[in-house]
């Protein structure tokens, strides 16, 4: 009898331990898979592609790659004498047409005063037409001069904001064309996190919810707030044919990959360029308030650690 009782006790204890282990694993797995978090997150920032509005030879490059610059600081300079001479030529054209317009105005006025008694109507109309033509040429020359005044200023390329110069690929002596990107400027204090959340986890993501950001390769946890959730993503399985009809790709019903939706997260504190734009991180949405790590259960701590390893 004692032997039977002992066997039943061992069996019951083993069964209870198995059930508890199953429950623990199940809860950890559910929390790991269904809670709003993602490893597919990246630091981002506002980036300005700087391109000159004039073409010419680069005479001076005043910065080096990855340098922190201030707003309006000179980045590089394009050959100025060419545009200064073009401005002088435009001003000379304006002066010429001003003198010519004055002469034609006097001539037309004289003929209008004399009238048809001294000359034909055709000669009077011709003088007025010539005056109007010269006035139009003067207006065109003035517009050209005003535009030429802008070009010497545009030969000096300045930083539009405080930030870091990156991917600098221009050097003194090179010829640069108008509109070609010369350098990128990563704006200071503009960093944020772009987290790509699976659609199955969006129920726990709302603007204003708090977030934890763990950069890859770091144990430091940054704090942030959900700023916005994207209103739509591209439907990769749907296209349009030549007649505008929808074309839907076939898929296997038992294999459904969740779409990832961009979620923008505003950082509580800017970290400078400690984590450059494009680097990855793990993001956990904690809800309306920050998570109190000291009150987490064993399962939550385990799941949180699992996230860091993927």
From Swiss-Prot:
Recorded GO molecular functions are: transmembrane transporter activity
Stored InterPro entries: CusB-like_dom_1, CusB_D23, MFP_Efflux_Pump, PHBA_efflux_pump_AaeA, RND_pump_MFP
Question: Coiled-coil stretches, from where to where?
Answer: none
| Keyword hit for Cell membrane | yes
Q: Name one GO cellular component term.
A: plasma membrane
Q: Which UniProt keywords apply?
A: Cell inner membrane, Cell membrane, Membrane, Transmembrane, Transmembrane helix, Transport
In Pfam terms, one family for this protein is: CusB_dom_1
Q: Where in the cell is it found?
A: Cell inner membrane
The record's principal subcellular location, in a coarse class, is membrane
**What membrane topology is annotated for this entry?**
Single-pass membrane protein
Transmembrane portions of the chain? 12-32
- PANTHER family xref list: P-HYDROXYBENZOIC ACID EFFLUX PUMP SUBUNIT AAEA (PTHR30367:SF12), P-HYDROXYBENZOIC ACID EFFLUX PUMP SUBUNIT AAEA-RELATED (PTHR30367)
> What is stated as this protein's family in its record?
Belongs to the membrane fusion protein (MFP) (TC 8.A.1) family.
**Known function:** Forms an efflux pump with AaeB.
Matching entries from NCBIfam families are given as: PRK10559.1, RND_mfp
Protein name listed in UniProt? p-hydroxybenzoic acid efflux pump subunit AaeA
Q: Which gene encodes it?
A: aaeA
């Amino acid at each position: 009898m004692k032997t039977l009782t002992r066997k039943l006790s061992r069996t019951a204890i083993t069964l209870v331990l198995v059930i508890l282990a199953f429950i623990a694993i199940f809860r950890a797995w559910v929390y790991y898979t269904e809670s709003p978090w993602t490893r597919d997150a990246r630091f981002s920032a506002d980036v300005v592609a700087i391109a000159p509005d004039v073409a010419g030879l680069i005479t001076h490059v005043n910065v080096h790659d990855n340098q922190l610059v201030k707003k309006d600081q000179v980045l590089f300079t394009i050959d100025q004498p060419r545009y200064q001479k073009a401005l002088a030529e435009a001003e000379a054209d304006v002066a010429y047409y001003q003198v010519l317009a004055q002469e034609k105005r006097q001539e037309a006025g004289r003929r209008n005063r004399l009238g048809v008694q001294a000359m034909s109507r055709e000669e009077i109309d011709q003088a007025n037409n010539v005056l109007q033509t010269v006035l139009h040429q003067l207006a065109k020359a003035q517009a050209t001069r005003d535009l030429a005044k802008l070009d010497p200023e545009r030969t000096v390329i300045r930083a539009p904001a405080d930030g870091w110069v990156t991917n600098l690929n221009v050097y003194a002596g090179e010829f640069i064309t108008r509109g070609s990107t010369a350098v990128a400027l990563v704006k200071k204090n503009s960093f944020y996190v772009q987290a790509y959340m699976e659609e199955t986890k969006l129920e726990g993501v709302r603007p204003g919810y708090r977030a934890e950001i763990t950069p890859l390769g770091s144990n430091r946890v940054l704090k942030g707030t959900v700023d916005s959730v994207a209103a739509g993503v591209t439907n990769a399985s749907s296209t349009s044919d030549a007649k505008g009809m929808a074309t839907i790709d076939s898929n296997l019903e038992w294999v459904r990959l969740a779409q990832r939706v961009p979620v923008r997260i505003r950082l509580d504190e800017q970290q400078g360029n400690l984590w450059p734009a494009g680097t990855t991180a793990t993001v956990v949405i904690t809800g309306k308030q920050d998570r109190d790590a000291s009150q987490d259960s064993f399962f939550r701590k385990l799941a949180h650690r699992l996230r860091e390893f993927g």
